[in-house]
């Protein structure tokens, strides 16, 4: 247990990645935490294989040339007169929308790869056997997400886009961080929270049945991954001293701001705009005119808004204090958010997905319905 890791519960005790000798301590074998047992046992309920057509068939067609994957209201740049007027041809407009979706799905794919590597790294540093088994299970699940999104992108577009510099830098920072709290807050709570918000938003709007099914299958896993971070917060945050809380709170705000910039900043799509004959700087200028604080706050009221999910995650975990409350208050009504309770957007979608998977995996047995990430 080290100050740098800010460990407040033995089940999150960690060692250096190259300290395998600590894993051979005899007392460690008899001190397995039971905190993750229900999440581990539930892996059978939400198992799926992206390479097995009984779960998902990537040969399902969709007219990418003539049908937009999502409503154009989801494409921020199209809310500007400059971009909307420039893309007057229906086919070119559709191509622009679907290319913007490719940008988002490519970011998701890179994020899933980051989650895979981070989960594997946790197996090397967490001492508790239960925590290790959970991390090993998540590693396997993230691997199928990488396969699933890679196959979907190949089917619909052929090839993903490069990982944006901002997202790449954050993923590298989280994965290489020696501090366990940085890994858990950065990935298990924020990147996974971002994923749940993004998946729910796309699930509710995507017109491609194949994309919709993939999103639901992935969400059945992500709901449990998000729970791992919540368990850490429940057992850690109440025991923090003011200095430790400030360290964790500042790290969370740093990750949030980075993810916000990566997703909504038009500077992240400059090359994409150029491919459509658009002046990237002009797009940014027009975007800033329409994206006022009032517009931003109103869009955040929608429960499926991606960053609303992130802020709610941090608020419910007790990480946000008066030090950073005003920062998050620029995007949401914090009092309104607090009154919503613990239920997260995407939970219902994930639970429906689990029932779908139970029907496939246990069709010869009567199974009890389960709630997502049960306590």
Language-model-detected regions and their locations in the chain:
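A short structural micro-motif
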Residues: 125, 140-141, 221, 225, ...
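Short, charged, amphipathic alpha-helical segments
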Residues: 133-136, 213-216, 246
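Active-site-adjacent scaffolding segments
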Residues: 149-202
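Active-site-proximal binding-pocket segments
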Residues: 195-240
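Amphipathic, well-ordered alpha-helical segments in soluble domains
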Residues: 111-118, 145, 191-198, 225
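Terminal targeting/low-complexity segments that flank the catalytic cores of oxidoreductases
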Residues: 1-119, 124-132, 155-162, 166, ...
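Carboxylate/His-rich catalytic cores and anion/metal-binding grooves
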Residues: 128, 133-158
